[in-house]
Amino acid sequence: MAVVLPAVVEELLSEMAAAVQESARIPDEYLLSLKFLFGSSATQALDLVDRQSITLISSPSGRRVYQVLGSSSKTYTCLASCHYCSCPAFAFSVLRKSDSILCKHLLAVYLSQVMRTCQQLSVSDKQLTDILLMEKKQEA
């Protein structure tokens, strides 16, 4: 089952993708909308995209995860398919307090999809499992 972002965010990302496809840039009005919806997280997410900090890791079985190198040089795992990030801000602000719908890492993943700037890495199913298990060990 796919997790759906609130309609306004889905629509904004869709319009941004169309604009990028048409003109290879994001118009200022969409950037202002991002800032309005996400506050400082929008700027931080765009910075992560600009620094090419997002890597899409895919395996032969079709599983896909994103890794985002955060501003603190720590790598976080994001699952766009179920709207999840392993960072503490996601656990606290999104899941626990419901202050936000996305952390900056997950927003960066969605923006990098729109802008088509994800680094790509293909790994075996075992390697992907090892990556996810290593992430789990680091959390513990």
Swiss-Prot record:
Q: Which UniProt keywords apply?
A: Disease variant, DNA damage, DNA recombination, DNA repair, Metal-binding, Nucleus, Zinc, Zinc-finger
Main subcellular location: nucleus
Where is it localised?
Nucleus
Q: Name one GO molecular function term.
A: zinc ion binding
Subunit text:
Interacts with RAD51D and XRCC3; involved in homologous recombination repair. Interacts with SWSAP1; they form a functional complex involved in homologous recombination repair and stabilize each other.
Q: Which disease is it linked to?
A: Ovarian dysgenesis 10: An autosomal recessive form of ovarian dysgenesis, a disorder characterized by lack of spontaneous pubertal development, primary amenorrhea, uterine hypoplasia, and hypergonadotropic hypogonadism as a result of streak gonads. Spermatogenic failure 71: An autosomal recessive male infertility disorder characterized by non-obstructive azoospermia.
* Protein name (Swiss-Prot/TrEMBL): Zinc finger SWIM domain-containing protein 7
Q: Which organism is it from?
A: Homo sapiens
